[in-house]
Swiss-Prot record:
The organism of origin for this protein: Lycosa singoriensis
Protein name: U8-lycotoxin-Ls1m
Keyword Signal applies: yes
InterPro entries linked to this entry: Spider_toxin_CSTX_knottin
GO cellular component: extracellular region
Main location: secreted
Length: 77
């Protein structure tokens, strides 16, 4: 009986440890996903690049996206 209780407690502890590790390992954000509130979560080959939004010369917001490192994006007219 004591062995069953001990085994149950050990299994419970192992399951809790695995759940805690899974919560800490957040999946990375793929290319073009919004990273405004999570700038460090882009996948390793990407960088969180932010752009300001302006209206009448005043900044009204900011957008951030996971983009390829070293790539320059230009606006097309």
């Amino acid at each position: 009986m004591k062995l069953m209780i001990f085994t149950g407690l050990v299994l419970f502890a192992i399951v809790r440890l695995i759940e805690a590790q899974a919560e800490n390992e957040k999946p990375c954000l793929p290319e073009y996903k919004v990273c405004t509130h999570a700038p460090g979560n882009c996948c390793s080959d990407l960088v969180c690049d932010c752009y300001g939004r302006y209206k009448s010369g005043a900044q009204i917001g900011r957008n951030c996206f996971c983009l390829q490192k070293g790539v320059i994006y230009k606006r097309e007219n």
